[in-house]
Amino acid sequence: MMSERAMPKPNCTEEVDVGTIEFARLGRRVVEGRFDGGSMTSDGGVMLLGEVDRKLGLLEAAARCIADPRSPLLIKHGVRDMLRQRVYGLALGWEDLNDHGALRCDVAMQTAVGVDREVASAPTLCRLEKWADRATAWRLHRVLVDQFIASFKTVPEELVLDFDATDNPLHGQQEGRFFHGYYDSYCYLPLYVFCGQQLLCAYLRSSCIDGARHAAAILKLLVRRLRQEWPEVRIIFRGDSGFCRQRIINWCERAG
């Protein structure tokens, strides 16, 4: 048996240099990630998210898809900044717009968005969402597909498009709510299309329809765009038995 004297003891007072993470500057403000300053925010990951977003330019491009009806002389929070705030909040788990009553004062959120003051309030973000219409949705999906294409350094030989319809449960009297027997709840039935880990389409729909509805039209549009970029790429449609519809099968056979 090892004696108490011989047992090693941890040195709890030893200083460990964990280094410093340097982020992009905001004006004259130097932004660093350190581990010796105490608990300043519970959402520090938003800084990394902001850096990745700026490198991709995703929300910068998405903001150009949303028409701003406001007078330029009266704008305090731009569309790009509000979109960043909303999307970053969702990524952090803050889904409710009311959460931004507190988040707008969070220094980490402000810095990630790219401002040095309070970001937009919940009512302002609500108005942003109201500006989006069907044309906005089409433009946003074009951004997703263009980002997907830009992610390839070489021409792919094969692409597998995964189609799936799933439930989005509802807990109130939202417009377009219907009871879905399979999911045994009131829900929406969005249609998603992925290629690997990348999202190509997210189409919000009522649940009173066939889960495969719209799939043929979306498949046709995606294949057309992808083959504009890569004429020889092999494209595979993949879905569960719910997508075994004659219209989809016939189109796939014609398109090759």
Residue spans for each PLM region:
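Acidic/histidine-rich, metal-coordinating catalytic segments
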Residues: 164, 232-244
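Dynamic "connector" segments at or just before major functional cores
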Residues: 1-210, 214-231
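Short, surface-exposed basic-aromatic patches at helix termini and helix-loop junctions that form
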Residues: 249-256
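Conserved protein kinase catalytic core
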Residues: 170, 244-246
